[in-house]
């Protein structure tokens, strides 16, 4: 199976979840850096609690229907002050985690996935606050 097919299969598997979870969040267009930081903390900690390897924040999927609607969010174009979003986020998360953004061209629209490793020995905090999700709520 080619990488693009694996990526689409991963997205379709995530979309098959009946509801968002402590380790999975869908967004259409909200790309607020503060929101992304809070979700990184919450999804990392939620993945740890649920004994998953990682959490996911997916842009371009409707959070109520789980339909692919696409997104125009381009993480590489976002800045916080003079810093690129990824650098700003890396500095705001403690302990440091190896998150990564991925763009996926799904047949129904362009998606961006933020892969967030599960917290390990200590909860992940954003700006010194550790967040946690209870089901779909942060």
Q: What is each PLM-predicted segment?
A:
Residues 1-138:
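Conserved N-terminal catalytic/coupling substructures associated with nucleotide/phosphate chemistry
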